[in-house]
Regions:
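Conserved class I S-adenosyl-L-methionine
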Residues: 108-119, 138
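Conserved alpha-helix/loop element of class I SAM-dependent methyltransferases that forms part
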Residues: 92-112
Length: 182
């Protein structure tokens, strides 16, 4: 079952960085972090200080230099990178397992997915990308802080994060639910 296109749901193909964007700051293969770009923001690390204002207007993937001459790369937040940089508030699934879940459940664009247990949001962001642009992920977590923290990913406009038990909230879902993933 594939849903009709919903005009208010669009993937953003804007490849330049602007204020409010989530950016993955890549120092080296084992040193990355997610940063929300803000007007007064600064990232400081062993390579120098990097002003967020220097990032705006640059394309994702750019190499930017700090005031000491060091550099970092500014990467777009894909689900794969998000899984590597997110705060592990719970045990998470990694890309190999996520790929198997999505394939096994035949999750494709247009599906509606119910996820019970948002956790750190690793699976949620990959599910949201898999169902985009016409599908939707409804995810529930009983822990309020985990549900709130998971909302910041780039794919959050394809997901609804709720703080409560899914059984208590099932009545608020549309009657077009296609896939249920635990």
């Amino acid at each position: 079952m594939v849903l009709q296109d919903l005009p208010d749901k669009k993937l953003s193909f804007n490849r330049t960085i602007k204020y409010g964007d989530l950016v993955i700051v890549y120092e080296k293969h084992d040193a990355m972090k997610a940063v929300m770009v803000s007007e007064d923001g600064v990232v400081q690390n062993r390579f120098g200080a990097f002003q967020h204002s220097d990032w705006t207007g640059k394309p994702f993937g750019s190499k930017v230099f700090g005031h000491k001459g060091g550099f970092v790369y500014l990467l777009a937040p894909t689900p794969e990178l998000w899984t590597l940089v997110l705060s592990h508030r719970t045990q998470i699934l990694y890309i190999a397992d996520i790929s198997f879940v999505i394939m096994y459940l035949e999750i494709v664009p247009g599906c509606l997915v119910l996820e019970s247990g948002t956790g750190s949001g690793s699976l949620t962001t990959s599910l949201a990308r898999a169902v985009a642009p016409t599908g939707h992920v409804f995810t529930f977590d009983f822990h309020e802080q985990r549900a709130a923290s998971a909302r910041i990913s780039q794919f959050s406009h394809f997901s609804q994060f709720r703080h409560n038990q899914p059984v208590q909230s099932i009545s608020v879902l549309p009657n077009r639910l296609f896939v249920v993933a635990n």
